[in-house]
Amino acid sequence: NEITEYSLGSDSSIGQRINFTINSWQVIKKNPIIGIGTGDFPQEYLKINQQNSPERRTTSNPHNMYILVLMELGIVGLISMLAIFYYQFKLSFNSPKKIICDSGFTLPVLFLVVMFSDSYLLGHYTTLMFVFFSSFLYKDFEKN
């Protein structure tokens, strides 16, 4: 229903997110490799929103971490971010302890999924939680 409402001009939650994504992709296509720069999303989004959909609400966050990273840091930034998660998967699979293997696999999966619905690594608390759990899950205690 919300997608239908969006096409009719309604300002629903999903409609706003669709609009954020459509407008963000316009900017990403112009700056695909290195993006527009860290922290420049709000200004660039305001410009593209005024151009494409001035009747719709603007935002300082596209509510999708992948879109945010692509827009600000380009493909280089997205690959760098995904490399962190790849390395976490690699470390978890190499752990001899089942609990570390399972938890070490679950943490990146959780974040990779929820980052489709919001920019969770943009907030201080969720970033701190991610780093805190990562520091314990991927530390090789046996080597000390």
Across the structure, where does each feature detected by a protein language model lie?
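Long extracytoplasmic/lumenal interhelical loops at the membrane interface
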Residues: Y6-I22, Q26, K30, I34-L73
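Generic recognition of well-ordered alpha-helical segments
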Residues: F20-N23, E44, M65, V69, ...
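Short, flexible micro-motifs
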Residues: T38-P42, G77-S80, T126
